[in-house]
Amino acid sequence: MKIAVLGDRDTALGFKLAGAHEVYAFEDTPLEMERLRNKLKELVERGDVGIILITERFAQRVEIPDVTIPIILQVPDKSGSKFGEEALREIVRRAIGVELKR
């Protein structure tokens, strides 16, 4: 299964250098968000993508499908994370089916 990344240019470059299989960079414009929506839909419908990473900023601008596979995770971009501990717990619960508590 492949890992795909959808994000801004800097985030995409970082994940490409880290070895992500497919990396797609977008600008924060309405036209680019439409391209991102189409690419996200395509990646979800393909059978060879297991994980999709999307920057938090872009995830707020598009509808994230509620699917089990591929796992869709939001990652921070260069401006930092907007997630709190509770949101991270929910991501882990959806990804592995177990709720983590302190």
From Swiss-Prot:
Q: Could you identify this protein by its name?
A: A-type ATP synthase subunit F
Give the organism the record lists: Desulfurococcus sp. (strain SY)
Q: Name one GO biological process term.
A: proton motive force-driven plasma membrane ATP synthesis
Subcellular location field: Cell membrane
This protein's membrane topology, according to the annotation, is: Peripheral membrane protein
- Show the GO MF annotations: ATP binding; proton-transporting ATP synthase activity, rotational mechanism; proton-transporting ATPase activity, rotational mechanism
Mind naming one GO cellular-component term on file for this protein? plasma membrane
Q: How does it assemble?
A: Has multiple subunits with at least A(3), B(3), C, D, E, F, H, I and proteolipid K(x).
Kindly give the SUPFAM superfamilies that the UniProt entry links to this protein: AtpF-like (SSF159468)
Keywords of this entry: ATP synthesis, Cell membrane, Hydrogen ion transport, Ion transport, Membrane, Transport
**In which domain of life is the source organism classified?**
Archaea
Q: Which gene encodes it?
A: atpF
The record's function comment reads:
Component of the A-type ATP synthase that produces ATP from ADP in the presence of a proton gradient across the membrane.
Similarity-based family:
Belongs to the V-ATPase F subunit family.
Q: Does the entry feature the keyword Cell membrane, yes or no? A: yes
* Tagged with keyword Cell membrane: yes
InterPro entries the record matches: ATPase_V1-cplx_f_g_su, ATPase_V1-cplx_fsu_bac/arc, ATPase_V1_fsu_sf
